[in-house]
UniProtKB/Swiss-Prot annotation:
Protein name: Sulfite reductase 1 [ferredoxin], chloroplastic
Residues noted as binding [4Fe-4S] cluster in the record, renumbered to the chain: 502, 508, 548, 552
Residue range covered by the transit peptide: 1-62
Chief location of this protein within or outside the cell: plastid
Length: 693
């Protein structure tokens, strides 16, 4: 199968330093609506002018026959088409004196790793700034880059760094006049923002723990290789931000070979973007790599999930591949939905880059480009089904996928606290509330990272791991971190340890209610409910909050997800599990934040009373069913007086306790509840002048 790409073209080049690609009678990549986009081949080559280091794209094409019906396509597709490979008009807009950029440039700058924002707390004129997002495969951040990002936050941002759910930094509050300085500084200090946003492959996730284990190291190497394979090649990023200066990178030969291979019609021949072409992908594309049991990356929420499969000796042999996950949706549109990835097949380790490329090309050729709400890979999977998707992808792969190998149960792993890496060094995972590095915490991190020359890794749960620590440094590092409020996990409320929120207000343009600023109070209220209904301090529930339905903090995988649905209002989602393998469902369509207790108190009370042994809240809600849960809420009249717990501690020998616990479980109670009943009955009998048998 050969990819085709082209159109009748008029190009203004001559002496124009910013040539504009004008394509008429556009027909394009295949879509699920059966329209054809870019149906004729476009032969593109690059030419360089000594007076202008920026790449100039020239093209020739056979005149095309006008299409009978112009296929519908989104406005963003037109912006991409006319952009000279994501350059124009951004390269002009960043040079003028306006504080903002125009609509086309606003879409294009996403490919460069930035979003234009404004402070929504302010009234009157808009105060524009830009958010920059880095790209760090597997969350790896060299010492030098961390220190530079820390400096840039103070010099050009709002004084904070935001750790994201895709293992990257976000730097907020950069003014347009400072964009080029900030971007070029990141580029020249071992960093990049290229492809952190936009319609292309985003940051590739991998377990952040720097274990010196074969499977973990292989997963990280694979994430790096996939990221390199799918990095844009046309040079637009460096043309805009460092005036075309070449940045030398060393790519493994297997990456170069896989990218250039066109034996199965995956590439655009002679194009500066052999995989993406001028139109790139229909929408964002997310990939994660991990090892068996380690679901720290939320593997099933990605467009592609890749799992290392090893033999009995621990030697990596190949990969299970899962496809079609994604979180984003639109309120009150049932045709949009979150979705879990499903098994595609197994490939030997030497084929992984070709398999990933084949999946990406299948989405490129068939994903919808007319309506961006339905452009993610998950909608193609839902439309086609896995069998058709597998069959089409195999044509680009050139082989049959083998059945997925059986894997053990998944676990969520945070890697907080101190751990041995396995090479003689230690690493320390630090909890950062909502990923916001600021104040004393920021200062403490800077001090230890700079003093001990530490590299770091960012986690998919908005936390940070300090790497390469010698045993002798453990105590002084722990002391400095504690002074900055970075405590060991045993000193942090368990509810906070797994909670996540997106930034939302005041800077996110999509937010419709609070998330990061609202979650501290919500967690305190949940903790208070726990205390009222008798849940232990050590018990927890995975809580995730977003300010809109796009799902950046992955609320649809939470045991309790709050999804912004209006000012101070949320949808309530229930049914995710602690190991992130089940999709939550909508329990309440709209709930004012002040009414949270009316819903959560009866749910947590009945969870404590009716749960099975070690049953999580998510598993409990799934077992009960939403109809029964709705009854709990509707009939709730408050915590029964008999369930109130006063400061009474009971002690028993082990044999008595175990017998009591076994008896209590039969009666759907815990040992303490049964003991209280025994005491209550004894007291009542004494008051009535009766003796106990």
């Amino acid at each position: 199968m050969t990819t085709s790409f082209g159109a009748a073209i008029n190009i203004a080049v001559a002496d124009d330093p910013n040539p504009k690609l004008q394509i008429h009678n556009f027909s394009g990549l295949k879509s699920t609506s059966n329209s054809l986009l870019l149906s004729r081949r476009l032969h593109v080559f690059q030419s360089f002018s000594p007076s202008n280091p920026s790449s100039i794209v020239r093209a020739v094409s056979t005149p095309a026959k006008p299409a009978a019906v112009e296929p519908k396509r989104s406005k963003v597709e037109i912006f991409k088409e006319q952009s000279n490979f994501i350059r124009y008009p951004l390269n002009e807009e960043i040079l003028n004196d306006a504080p903002n950029i125009n609509e086309a440039a606003t879409q294009l700058i996403k490919f460069h790793g930035s979003y234009m924002q404004y402070d929504r707390d302010e009234r009157g004129g808009r105060s524009y700034s830009f958010m920059l997002r880095t790209k760090n495969p597997g969350g790896e951040v060299p010492n030098r880059l961390y220190l530079v990002m820390d400096d840039l936050a103070d010099q050009f941002g709002i004084g904070t760094l935001r750790l994201t759910t895709r293992q990257t930094f976000q730097l907020h509050g950069v003014l347009k006049k400072n964009l080029k300085t900030v971007m070029s500084t990141i580029i020249k200090n071992m960093g990049s923002t290229l492809g952190a946003c936009g319609d292309l492959n985003r940051n590739v996730l991998a377990p952040a723990a720097p274990f010196a284990k074969k499977d973990y190291m292989f997963a990280k190497q694979t994430a790096d290789n996939i990221a390199a394979l799918l990095t844009p090649q046309s040079g637009f990023y460096y043309d805009v931000w460092v005036d075309g200066e070449k940045v030398m990178t060393a790519e493994p030969p297997e990456v170069v070979k896989a990218r250039n291979d066109n034996s199965h019609g995956t590439n655009f021949p002679d194009s500066p973007e052999p995989i993406y072409g001028t139109q790139f992908l229909p929408r964002k594309f997310k990939i994660a790599v991990t090892v068996p049991t380690d679901n720290s990356v939320d593997i099933f929420t990605n467009d592609i999930g890749v799992v290392v499969v090893s033999n009995e000796d621990g030697e990596p042999q190949g990969f299970n591949i899962y496809v079609g996950g994604g979180m984003g949706r639109t309120h009150r549109m049932e045709t949009t939905f979150p979705r879990l990835a499903e098994p595609l097949g197994y490939v030997p380790k030497e084929d992984i880059l070709y398999a990933v490329k084949a999946i990406v090309v299948t989405q490129r050729e068939n994903g919808r480009r007319d309506d961006r709400r339905y452009s993610r890979l998950k909608y193609l999977l839902s439309s086609w089904g896995i069998e058709k998707f597998r069959s089409v992808t195999e044509q680009y792969y050139g082989k049959k996928f083998q059945p997925c190998r059986e894997l053990p149960e998944w676990e969520f792993k945070s890697y907080l606290g101190w751990h041995e890496a396995g090479d003689g060094s230690l690493f320390c995972g630090l909890h950062v509330d909502n990923g916001r590095v600021k104040g004393a915490m920021k200062k403490a991190l800077r001090e230890v990272i700079e003093k001990y020359n530490l590299n770091v890794r960012l986690t998919p749960n908005q936390n940070i791991i300090l790497c390469n620590i010698r045993q002798a440094w453990k105590r002084p590092i722990t002391t400095v971190l504690a002074q900055g409020g970075l405590l060991q996990p045993r000193y942090v409320d368990p509810l906070n340890l797994t909670a996540m929120a997106c930034p939302a207000f005041p800077l996110c343009p999509l937010a419709i209610t609070e998330a990061e600023r609202g979650i501290p109070d919500i967690l305190k209220r949940v903790r208070a409910i726990f205390e009222r209904v008798g849940l232990k301090y050590s018990e927890s529930v995975v809580i995730r909050i977003t300010g809109c339905p796009n799902g950046c903090a992955r609320p649809y995988m939470a045991e309790l997800g709050l999804v912004g649905d209006g000012p101070n209002s949320y949808q309530i989602w229930l049914g995710g599990t602690p190991n992130q393998t089940s999709l939550a469902k909508t329990f309440k369509d709209k709930l004012k934040v002040q009414d949270l207790e009316k819903v959560l108190e009866p749910l947590f009370f009945h969870w404590r009373r009716k749960r099975q042994s070690k049953e999580s809240f998510g598993d409990f809600t799934n077992r009960m069913g939403f109809e029964k849960l709705g009854e709990f809420v509707e009939k709730w009249e408050g915590i029964p007086e008999s369930s109130s717990r006063y400061n009474l501690k009971l002690f028993a020998d082990r044999e008595t306790y175990e017998a009591m616990d076994a008896l209590a479980s039969i009666q759907d109670k815990n040992a303490h509840q049964l003991a209280i009943e025994v005491v209550r009955n004894y007291v009542a009998s004494q008051q009535n002048g009766k003796s106990m048998d």
